[in-house]
Amino acid sequence: MLIIPAIDIKGGKCVRLTRGDFEQEKIYLDEPSDMAIIWRKQNAKLIHVVDLDAALTGKPENFDKIKQIVDTLDIPIEIGGGIRTAEDAARYLDIGVYRVVIGSAAVKNPSLVSQLIEKYGPRKIVVGIDAEDGIAKISGWTESSQKKDYELALEMKDRGVERIIYTDITRDGTLEGVGYETTKAFAEKAQMRITASGGVFGKQDLSKLCKLEHLGVDSVIIGKALYEERFPCQKLWHLFEESISLDTNFSTAEQKQNSVAG
């Protein structure tokens, strides 16, 4: 089970929302790239980044902040939020983003998904399904798609998608525990690779999700539980480290440049 830390960006800052409510935000750091370095130092293998502003406007509002994260780290970054055209996807992939997450556009313009899969392949293009009571929601969770979550997944599967990021909106940002039953029901019907998201409280939730690995649930995105240090290992890190330095260079681009120069 791969643990994927989440970084949500709103107004250029690293924030967390509760159930996707833009009026219930908590700012954790002014610089998202600083948060990315912290997660990298805590052994993250992949980081999930969302441009919350773009999810509403459809424009890459925090592109520069995302590029800064990509330039800083030496691990893959996936980005979601407001990616609604082929140009949007290309712009992110061109700066080194590992893969992009298509959300609202999968409902409003499903042919875009086929186009992107054909050009970049299924490793670079995944679909995010954010569900409330089994119905997929779009446009920053402000609109209903009128489609059942698993039906949308099967449609995307027919278009070549291999992975779904499945978020239980009713749990997201609440620390009330992962939506085990909803995730299980979705996984049973979708029969795809699935990254679970929403509501993770602690290690007991990870143990539950591990029981779904045979259904394709092989990874989980964790936000607030990591920010609020709900895992014992995080407390140990702080006990043995006087401070977390943010000056270490993780830049893949600079490492390559130094290698060539040497």
Swiss-Prot record:
InterPro entries: Aldolase_TIM, His_biosynth, HisA_bact_arch, Isoase_HisA-like, Isoase_HisA-like_bact, RibuloseP-bd_barrel. It comes from the Bacteria. One of its GO terms (biological process) is L-tryptophan biosynthetic process. The keyword Chaperone does not apply. It is an enzyme of class 5 (isomerase). It catalyses: 1-(5-phospho-beta-D-ribosyl)-5-[(5-phospho-beta-D-ribosylamino)methylideneamino]imidazole-4-carboxamide = 5-[(5-phospho-1-deoxy-D-ribulos-1-ylimino)methylamino]-1-(5-phospho-beta-D-ribosyl)imidazole-4-carboxamide. PANTHER family: 1-(5-PHOSPHORIBOSYL)-5-[(5-PHOSPHORIBOSYLAMINO)METHYLIDENEAMINO] IMIDAZOLE-4-CARBOXAMIDE ISOMERASE. Belongs to the HisA/HisF family. This is 1-(5-phosphoribosyl)-5-[(5-phosphoribosylamino)methylideneamino] imidazole-4-carboxamide isomerase.
